[in-house]
Amino acid sequence: MALSAAEKSAIVKEYQTAETDTGSPEVQVALLTANINKLQGHFSDHKQDHHSRRGLIRMVNQRRKLLDYLKGKNVERYASLIQRLGLRR
């Protein structure tokens, strides 16, 4: 269910703002979105997996907090990230 190291590094390379950037809000939101999308596929097969559902809800909340932070700091970066990730906002 977790992302492999290769998947993580590909996402980091795509969304990083500098060569050594691995912790910017954009990278963190992109990684959380990939994990969330992967878990949603898991729940189509395992509807009763409430333990993992709790983890999914935590990830969604963390992503929301990071997006709110980014929106407060720089609206242009926020809008660009939302569009690139295909989130509904």
Curated annotation (Swiss-Prot):
GO terms for cellular component: cytosolic small ribosomal subunit. CDD domains: Ribosomal_S15p_S13e. SUPFAM superfamilies: S15/NS1 RNA-binding domain. Pfam families: Ribosomal_S15 (PF00312). One of its GO terms (molecular function) is rRNA binding. GO terms for biological process: translation. Keywords: Ribonucleoprotein, Ribosomal protein, RNA-binding, rRNA-binding. One of the primary rRNA binding proteins, it binds directly to 16S rRNA where it helps nucleate assembly of the platform of the 30S subunit by binding and bridging several RNA helices of the 16S rRNA. Forms an intersubunit bridge (bridge B4) with the 23S rRNA of the 50S subunit in the ribosome. HAMAP family: Ribosomal_uS15_B. Part of the 30S ribosomal subunit. Forms a bridge to the 50S subunit in the 70S ribosome, contacting the 23S rRNA. Belongs to the universal ribosomal protein uS15 family. This is Small ribosomal subunit protein uS15. The gene is rpsO.
